[in-house]
Every structure is written in structure tokens, then in C-alpha cells.
Amino acid sequence: MLGRSNSKDAKAEREILNVNAEKFFTCHVRCSKLYVLEKISREGLVLKDTRITQLLYSAHIGDGCYVKNSTGEKFGYVSYCLNYISYDLRYLTYKRDLFITNGFSCSNYRITCSGYKKNSFGFNFSVRSFGELNKVGAMSKIDVISRLNKFGLIIYYLDDGSYHQKRNFGHLYCNDFTPEEVDSLVEKVYELYPIKKCAIRLDRKKDGREYPYLYIPVSTMKVFKEDVFSFLKRNRLNSLYYKAGLPSQTIENLR
């Protein structure tokens, strides 16, 4: 009887070991596949369309939210996804389509509450992790600003800038910038539009908080808004014409 009991115990122990081994193997395979996928995502492809990189730059300093992925940290590196939000679905679609046509993976649109106004809603989507996104996510603002071209500046302005119709100047908001980053932005705008340098101003709140922004002089804005309008017209972003000092137009107005 004792031998039988030991035999049964040994058999049960082997079954437990087999189950644990199968679980370990399954987990190992899954982790290996995940590692390969993350490695591909991390290294990415060579970007042929420079507009993608400029979208990533403008999102880093403006209207975009880089989110660290916890998965990458398990394998010893940092990866990011990127979230966009806007009231203007057509403008958001322009960005999403640009990523998708260049082979990158984006989520579907979601309706989300806006933090700017009570009971208001916007649209958002996310761009999944890939090599260039991870590189830009790890860059400093000053490094990003130094790499902006006119396209990137236009996107940044459309996201975080304003045009003042009656006085014909512009503002470029950089609320969370350090003084050094603000100075770097001033120099970049002047590098791209060497007409007259932007002035640094402060938005002072009643509670004592201060936020920096750039004042774009009339002479500089006159040239810059022509490029903004050309971009908007070319991409049929009629609802954003007010950013170039013109009345916004809907599709119905154009018919």
C-alpha cells in the first residue's frame, strides 16, 4: 500500500511539473514574441516623409501628449505612445491620415471631455509606439526646437498659437517652457522668419502664476500667415482660416 501511495504521489508530482513547464514555456514564447515586437517598434523604419518627424517635434513642445509605455521598461528601455486631442475633427484627421499613409498604427477616434470648457467635448486618437516617436519622446525641448522647420512651426502655431484680427500680430504659447527654452524658441522663429524677433511676454494670472508666450510682431506675422494660409488651403482645412487672419469657412460655404 505504501508503494502505491508513493507511486501516486510521484505521478501527481510529475503532472504538476509538466503543467508548470507548459506554463513557463507558453509565458516564455509570449514574452519572446512581445520582445521582438517591441524591438521592431523601438528600432522602427526609416522615415521618408519629414512631415512625420515634424509632427512629432511640434507635439513634443505643443499640443500632444507623450505617454511612457510600461511594457518597454520591463525590457530595459523607454518607449512612448502619442495622444492627440482637438475640437477640429478635420484637422485631427489630417494628422492621423499622415501617420497612417506612412505605415504607422493609430487608434480609432474617441470622444473625450475637454479640460478647457465645462460640458465641452473634443476628439482624440493615439499613435502607437515606433522608433522615431521614442527618440523624440526622450529629447529635450531645446533639442526639439532646434530641429523645427517651417512645417513644424506652422503645426505648432495651429495647435498653440493665435492671430489677433484687428491688430494683425500673433501669439505663440509656451506655458510650461523654461526661460532657456523660451529663448531657444525666439531664436528658431527668427531663424525661419528673419524679419523681426518675437518678444517674450508673460500671462499673469490673478493667483500670481505667470506663463510665458511669444508676441509675433506684425511684420513677421504678415509673412508667416501667408505660409499658414497656403498650408490650410492646400490641405482644405477651411475651418482654421482664422489662424491666418481670414474668416473660417465650412464645406457648405464653399459649395
What are these regions (language model features)?
Residues 1-255:
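Internal intein/HINT superfamily modules and their associated LAGLIDADG
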